[in-house]
Amino acid sequence: MTEQKTNRTEEQLEQELRKSKGGKLSGKILSMLGVVIAVAGIILGGNLVLVVIGRVILGLGQMVQGKSKEQSDRQAFDAIAPDIVGTVFENVQMNPDPPLLDANDTNIPLPNHTCCSGSGYIRGTYHGLNTELCTVRLTEVSEFQREETGMWEKNEQVVYTGQWMLSELNREFPTWLTIWPRDKMDKLFRSKTIQTGNEDFDKRFNLSSDDEEVVLRILSPDRMERILALAGSSIGKFAVNLKPDGRLYIAVHSGHGFFDIGKGRENPAQLRERFARELRWFTDMIEVFCGE
């Protein structure tokens, strides 16, 4: 009976994914039409009517695309997420209130932003550890003046979308540490970072703490090798913040959230496999910091 129910759910999801592709295509066509009309209005001496009509159609097209994807994401979440999460966590709570995970509570370096928001919170216990995951989005709001109308408008741009997890390790540490990607500018200007002695690790990551000697005892050679191994299978650049009270924050700049259908090209079985793989990556990182 359970298998029949699962098959029906996945058939419904497959139908929803097909609808999503059609909705996204319609939205793209509307968006392109809106751009063409707006550009034509500008070329024709700043025809305000055409510009406004073009912008309205463009906005409508973007809304259609967004709504279509949102519906498919929800369908995928309802059909797949409970099973995936239930195999990893116990005592699962969907949308716990208030959430434990707060991106502003960490010193993980993030892009400049105006607003930080979290969504899709899920809480459970992983091997007895309170654990919570969510999607974090950062947006930057700016104002600009349109030449063709002279009107000031606000522009809201998403500058970061990532998957985050918080796990309470039920133990204390003598200091804090933060690990984050070492980019080209860091290498060019030789930004200050704690050197671990592991050449591969030092090339790939920055490390900060308020006690260099102690943090190198926490970040043992075995832990560094395990982190490097996980870096090879990561779905994006990631950062880790371990606090003295044992709270471990893991942040992956993947460009999407947990249980996100992406471009809608995967069938339900492929989505299930990817969702499970992404969640397993996070729990593997928790394991790195468990024990001595």
PLM region spans:
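Loop-to-transmembrane boundary segments
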Residues: 19-29, 111-113
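Hydrophobic alpha-helical transmembrane segments
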Residues: 42-56
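Charged, low-complexity intrinsically disordered regions
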Residues: 82, 86-91, 96-140, 144, ...
